[in-house]
From Swiss-Prot:
Described function: Required for vesicle-mediated transport. Catalyzes the fusion of transport vesicles within the Golgi cisternae. Is also required for transport from the endoplasmic reticulum to the Golgi stack. Seems to function as a fusion protein required for the delivery of cargo proteins to all compartments of the Golgi stack independent of vesicle origin. Involved in spikelet development. Regulates protein storage vacuole (PSV) morphology in endosperm cells. Forms a quaternary complex with the two glutelin zipcode RNA-binding proteins RBP-L and RBP-P, and the membrane trafficking factor RAB5A.
Location of this chain's protein in the cell: Cytoplasm
Protein known as: Vesicle-fusing ATPase
Species lineage: Eukaryota, Viridiplantae, Streptophyta, Embryophyta, Tracheophyta
Domain of life where this protein originates: Eukaryota
Note: Overexpression of NSF decreases plant height and grain weight, and alters the morphology of protein bodies.
Keyword Transmembrane: no
Family classification: Belongs to the AAA ATPase family.
Entries under InterPro entries matching the protein: AAA+_ATPase, AAA_lid_3, Asp_de-COase-like_dom_sf, ATPase_AAA_core, ATPase_AAA_CS, Cdc48_dom2, CDC48_domain_2-like_sf, CDC4_N-term_subdom
Subunit details: Homohexamer. Binds to SNARE-SNAP complexes to form 20S particles. Interacts with the 60S acidic ribosomal protein P0 (60SP0). Forms a complex with the heterologous pentameric complex formed by P0 and dimers of P1 and P2. Interacts with RBP-P and RAB5A.
Native organism: Oryza sativa subsp. japonica
Keywords: ATP-binding, Cytoplasm, ER-Golgi transport, Hydrolase, Magnesium, Metal-binding, Nucleotide-binding, Protein transport, Transport
Length: 743
């Protein structure tokens, strides 16, 4: 047979010929889907198949009423090939390839003439048998419209899908022979009044515009698992015919709640779900838009959202289209009933109205609500139970593979346009952008592009012509962008560095041992499956280096999420506000696979005062609960606490909730010697004497004394001392030390 040269499915043989278009000789012949030529012309087509125009293949038959050089087409064929009677059209012999039989054919049915107020049921099994017999071995092409008669009524079917044997969904769907083994799926055209019954051959595909999902083309990156869950929970049952769902005895899911941190793609996913669906355009409600100053108007606005779905269900029943309603920032209008004190009760009425529409006495079965929020805790509980917004999908921060997909999506166009430099390594960027949300990654790309564009602009002469061809976004641009765009969630490096302004110095065996123990706990969090929560308490005298040690463990852990909770960031907060802030840090930590939380100076967080004694029981109970709370599945957390009042923590039972407690000691003479040698501000001969005086000294106090002594007797010597030009006078150092009464 001839080779494939038209869309991969065979082609014309012997070149095309121009023929004059005529009308089909008789009305009964118009329902055969064949084209008619003269007896002389049909000899030019060995397979009796012709490619008419450039899109459709018709079976040819000879007819005496057709003159030589003419081809007779019915009205629908002429309309689809865009010709009129008397026009000329190119006709080529079509040679089908091997394996040209259709495995699956999806047809959309409608009346030839639109009929009002008429509902008719068509048996899918009987209709499929007749169509196979009537159009056997004819070529069916996607988009083709074919008239036919069934039980005395004329109909038209449109080919929505034509799938060959062994053909994958990802390959182009075009045409093939209708055989006796071809599965046929029938779909009624919208508002046609036709109802297909006894449809058992395959799942319905009319729910979606596309036959497959390519999330990257939709601009969705890193959310394939979440999208799969949404499809399984909310759409899988809707793909099957209604009679299958009725036999299963289940109801469709009517609501999805997308929740998670800002910028992770909740709104994007809801918008793209709406674009995927056939039929009605989604209604998008931006939270407070439904509110009105008039009494009862707010509830009416909610009812109006469901009006189209109600009318559709009344007229079409189970065949009605799916109506999607998207609520952005749903927490603004669906707060827990009784939580707002505005005196009007309008927020409670909104929740009540939604509940009755979704799952009331006359509940609709053709609606799907998609709500989005980053405050799931504010929503009314009744709205979240099965039958309402029952599918809860957390849209979390993307992992490394997800970040790579997002970066590829946002750099795809510049790569196609050759604006992306070859030295840009997206894999490396994905690895370096831990805890970046999708919106922040988009911000990184925009920032990198701004650097590239700025290089082409002369600030001295803004009228200078721009050279578009020389625009290149380089790896350096992305590195600069990473410094400019920082993640809202992640390691608070600046806060951690403030805990060790002088770096981390080797202070001897005791401190080195504690650091190694801390890194062992980090490793335990990484690999352990049985202990997702590890807690550690560092106790010791004030200034002994507890905070610096905890911060160093956090920085060296290379965890994506490291946060420090200290009293200095909550000055002026009420007790309840402090509790809320502490809870928020823990909740954010649960969003990362590995996280570290440092509770710095726990006694200060608890507002402890020795006289009394006095402390905040609310904050104490909050910490006790959170330190025992196991993180969600797949999330591991290390909590490091520091305190100078271990006796107080023992008295309130706080020490018992920590897995291990380590004592951070003051410096001994040999430890002080190491630190002084590292600082290199004393003469070698004076180091031992200075270290002897610093025995049992907290390291923070040591640094303070050295800095005071470095000023010199009359001041102004610090720059020379730290520059290595001078050394601290040992006698002046002892003089400074003698002024310190207590350390």
């Amino acid at each position: 047979m001839a080779g494939r040269n038209y869309h991969g499915y065979g082609g014309g043989g012997g070149g095309g010929m121009s023929m004059v278009v005529a009308s089909t000789p008789g009305q009964e012949l118009a329902l055969t889907n064949c084209a008619y030529v003269s007896s002389a012309d049909i000899r030019r087509f060995p397979n009796a198949l012709a490619l008419v125009g450039d899109a459709f293949v018709f079976t040819l038959r000879a007819h005496d009423a057709v003159s030589a050089g003419s081809i007779a087409l019915n009205a629908i064929q002429r309309r689809q090939t865009k010709v009129s009677a008397g026009d000329s059209i190119t006709v080529s012999s079509f040679a089908p390839p091997d394996d040209f039989k259709l495995a699956l054919l999806t047809l959309e049915l409608e009346y030839t003439k639109a009929r009002t107020n008429r509902n008719e049921e068509l048996d899918a099994v009987v209709l499929a048998q007749q169509l196979r017999r009537r159009f056997l071995d004819q070529v069916m092409t996607s988009g083709q419209r074919v008239p036919f008669e069934f039980c005395g009524t004329n109909y038209i079917f449109t080919v929505n899908q034509a799938l060959l044997d062994g053909q994958e969904n990802s390959t182009p769907l075009d045409r093939g022979f209708l055989s006796s083994d071809t599965y046929i799926i029938f779909e009624a055209a919208p508002n046609s009044g036709i109802k297909v019954v006894n449809q058992k051959e395959a799942a319905s595909s009319k729910l979606f515009k596309h036959k497959e999902f390519n999330l990257e083309k939709l601009g969705i990156g890193g959310l394939s698992a979440e999208f799969t869950d949404i499809f399984r929970r909310a759409f899988a049952s809707r793909v099957f015919p209604p009679h299958v769902v009725n036999k299963l005895g289940i109801k469709h899911v009517k609501g999805i709640l997308l929740y998670g941190p800002p910028g992770t793609g909740k709104t994007l996913m809801a918008r793209q779900i709406g674009k995927l669906l056939n039929g009605n355009e989604p209604k998008i409600v931006n939270g407070p838009e439904v509110l009105s100053k008039f009494v009862g108007e707010t509830e009416k606005n909610v009812r109006d959202l469901f009006a189209d779905a109600e009318n559709d269900q009344k007229t079409r029943g189970d065949q009605s289209d799916l109506h999607v309603i998207i609520f952005d920032e749903i927490d603004a209008i669906c707060k827990s009933r009784g939580s707002t004190r505005d005196g009007t009760g309008v927020h409670d009425s909104i929740v009540n109205q939604l509940l009755t529409k979704i799952d009331g006495v006359e509940a609709l079965n053709n609606v799907l609500l998609i709500g989005m929020t980053n405050r799931k805790d504010l929503l009314d509980e009744a709205l979240l139970r099965p039958g309402r917004l029952e599918v809860h999908i957390e849209i979390n921060l993307p992992d490394e593979n997800g970040r790579l997909q997002i970066l590829q999506i946002h750099t795809n166009k510049m790569k196609e346009s050759s604006f992306l430099s070859p030295n840009v390594n997206l894999q490396e960027l994905a690895a370096r952008t831990k805890n970046y949300s999708g919106a922040e990654l988009e911000g990184v790309v925009k920032s990198a592009v701004s650097y590239a564009l700025n290089r082409q602009i002369s600030m001295d002469d803004l009228t200078k012509p721009l050279d578009e061809e020389s625009i290149k976004v380089t790896m350096d641009d992305f590195v600069n962008a990473l410094h400019e765009i920082t993640p809202a969630f992640g390691a608070s490096t600046d806060d951690l560095e403030r805990c060790r302004l002088r770096g981390m110095v080797d202070c001897g065996k005791a401190h080195r041992h504690l650091y190694e123990r801390g890194m062992l706990l980090v490793e335990q969090v990484k690999v352990s499956k049985g202990s997702p929560l590890v807690t550690c308490l560092l106790e010791g005298p004030a200034g002994s280096g507890k905070s610096a040690l905890a911060a160093t463990v956090g920085i060296d852990s290379d965890f994506a999420y490291v946060k420090i909770i200290s009293a200095e960031t909550m000055i002026g907060f009420s007790e309840s506000s402090k509790c809320a802030q502490i809870c928020k840090v823990f909740e954010d930590a649960y969003k990362s696979q590995f996280g570290i939380i440092i509770l710095d100076d726990i006694e200060r967080l608890l507002e402890y005062v020795a006289i009394g004694p006095r402390f905040s029981n609310i904050i104490s109970q909050t910490l006790l609960v959170l330190l025992k709370r196991v993180p969600p599945k797949g999330k591991n957390l290390l909590v490091i606490g520091t305190t100078s009042e271990v006796g107080f923590l023992e008295s309130i039972g706080m020490c018992d909730v920590f897995s291990v407690t380590y004592h951070v000691p003051k410096l001994k003479k040999e430890d002080a010697t190491k630190v002084l040698r590292h600082l290199n501000v004393f003469d070698e001969a004076d180091i031992d004497a200075a270290a002897e005086a610093l025995d049992d000294m907290p390291i923070k106090k040591l640094y303070t004394l050295v800095e005071m002594a470095a000023q010199g007797p009359s001041g102004g010597s610090a720059e020379a001392v730290y520059g290595g030009e001078e050394k601290i006078d040992i006698n002046h150092f002892f003089s400074i030390l003698s002024d310190i009464i207590r350390y």
